[in-house]
């Protein structure tokens, strides 16, 4: 799936003539999110101790974990994503922008699933996590995979 997106984007960019080398911005972003993806898969993160998190219902813990995972993935490639977005906006390539919207490494995560929770606690957890992580490993370490 990831390769299909990158190939589609490359084809769209190569067909658009502008003074900016859009392909180099795409390549930088692509290289960055691939590195972040590898980092997350190999992460040995120990989830920060948090009495607040421990007291949450299982569904809320899952929502927080998913949000934090998506946030750290996005933050890992945020600089490259912002540069690519700026180039795409200047070139008015709306099809490519639409294709990338919602891709976790291109957009900040939606807070809807955690909006009812204490945002200062979510932010504290986010600050305590250094970078991308493996959410399945963390969920397993926290005992969240058992029904």
Identify the meaning behind each predicted range.
Residues 4-14:
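Sec-dependent N-terminal signal peptides
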Residues 11, 30-31, 69-71:
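Disulfide-bonded cysteine motifs in exported proteins
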Residues 14, 33-36, 73-78:
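Extracellular secreted precursors and ectodomains with disulfide-bonded cysteine-rich loops/domains
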Residues 16-62:
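Immediate post-signal-peptide N-terminus of mature secreted/exported proteins
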Residues 55-105:
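Mature extracytoplasmic domains of secretory-pathway proteins
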Residues 95-147:
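C-terminal amphipathic alpha-helix
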